[in-house]
Every structure is written in C-alpha cells, then in structure tokens.
C-alpha cells in the first residue's frame, strides 16, 4: 500500500500531546519526507523531541529538507524562541549550519542572533559557524539583528550581543547607527509602552549603550499643551523634525492643532514618498482635507500661499518629492 505524501492535518497538535511511540505509528503510514503545516515542511519542522528527531534521521528523513518558503528545519526552528531546543538538537544531529533563506540569504547564525536565541548561538559557534558571515546585503548577524531591532527586541538581543562581542565580533558603525535608531524610536514612544516592561527594557538599553559605545538617547520632552511653542532650528526641514518630536505623540492624534498639522503632513509624506501610495484610501484623502482646514485656522497663510497649498492638496495623491517638500515647508 502506497504511503501518503502529506502529514495528517492535526500533526502539530498530535506531536504536542502524543508519545513518541504513537507519533512513530502515525509516521509509519507516511512517506519519510511527508510534508505538512503552513510551510509544508517535513516532520523535522515540528516540535519533536531530540530522540524522535534522531529516530527519523535513522529512518532516512532529509535533515535539510527545504519547505515551500525556503526554510530547512534548522532555519525554521532557529527563527522561533520556543523552538530553540529543536534547533540545538538539529545542530547536534548534523543539520547544515550554512543553509540560507530569503532574498538576503540570511544564514542560520543570522536568524538565531536576530531571534535572540543565545544558547543556539553558542551551539552554532561550537559547531564551527562563522559569527561574522555576511548576508547578500553585506551585513553580519549582529548588524542584521540591530538593523531590524525594535523596542522589546533589544531585551533578547542584549545578552546575545554581549556574548558575540565577548568572543571577538567587532562593533561596527552600522551596529551603532542601528542601535541609536532603535533607542530613538523607544524614547519617542515611551509614554505609550507598558510600564511593566520598561524596567527590563531600560536595563537592556543601558547595557547596550555601554557595550556598543553609543551615547544614551535623552528622554523625550513633550509639549505641555499651554506653553508657547518655541522653535530653535533654522531650516524648515529641521523645524518640522523638531516640532514632530515636541508635538506628535507616539500613537494616535496629537493634542493640538499644531501637532495635527505636523503629524498629518508627515504621514502624507511617508505614504506618498516611501510607500508609493500603496496604502492610500479615503482616510488619507480625509487627512489631506483636514490638513487644509487646519492651515486656514489661527494665523493662516497669506492668500497666495493658501491658493498654492489648496492646489497641492487637490493633487496630493500624484504629488512628487518637490510637491511634498513644498507642502511640508508651508
């Protein structure tokens, strides 16, 4: 009788509740490389015990089977905090530690560092993995991790960075720049973050500041709603950034009309210039109309500039960088 090419639909639930012997009985009815799950990987991509993995390898399963998204079992588990023990088991059982995935050809080491799997990183080093291997874009695992690090990622990244730097991985200017960017984003949104996680996040940030030689990002000073709004910068681009930091909250609407003018102009610029209007909908058009109403309030632009601004708003979706810069300047 021919064996099935796919794993049972409930295989993931099965491996979490059934014994290894029961799992073997189920797998005995399947081809050794039968695939399943969202990624259509073979059985090694599921949360099996090390003993079960060893048995499958002895039966001839492909330890480096590539699923429909380009992941080997090791790459798949390396990218999940809860799968670290499976990833370590696969390294010990001989999985290819040089396998890559994605358009940027990230290695297992890249994935493990980015995920914050410290014990897996140590295991990979012991197995001979290169801690300074570069992706297609030329980034080392530590550079790649800081490139994508946001808010709480720094908590899990701090001990990994300490370990890698401790064994000689260099701290590059890229890493410092990425760390600075992540820290600035955290300080901008600090008020909106859960206070329960902040002590741990602050400890991680202080550790990384010292470890990487990055100056601490100062706490954000927000507008109190009543004081005069004072601008210190001279160029309009710098003025917009200064007002953004002062008036725009980490999330939601600003508390003042001035803040809404800065917030909306910034959101429109990002959607048009950075996203090429891929998310454009009636909400963005409404924001553009609201921006024009706000501009006409208080101390409005002179008549000529109001007409110019109205023209820019009417053609906002088709605006180019020059148009957006002029709108933001006004």
Where are the model-predicted features located?
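Ankyrin repeat domain, specifically the short helix-to-loop turn at the C-terminus of the second helix
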Residues: 24-31, 54-63, 88-97, 122-130, ...
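Internal alpha-helical scaffold/solenoid segments in large eukaryotic proteins
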Residues: 105-139
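Ankyrin-repeat boundary/"N-cap" motif
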Residues: 4-12, 34-46, 66-79, 100-108, ...
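Ankyrin repeat (ANK) tandem arrays and their immediately adjacent linkers/low-complexity segments
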Residues: 102-107, 133-330
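Ankyrin-repeat intra-repeat helix-capping/turn positions
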Residues: 18, 48-51, 81-82, 116, ...
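N-terminal segments that cap or nucleate solenoid repeat domains
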Residues: 2-46, 51-56, 61
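Coil-to-helix interface segments in alpha-helical RNA-associated scaffolds
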Residues: 49, 82-86, 119, 152-157
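Eukaryotic tandem repeat interaction scaffolds
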Residues: 84-90, 96-102, 106-110, 114-116
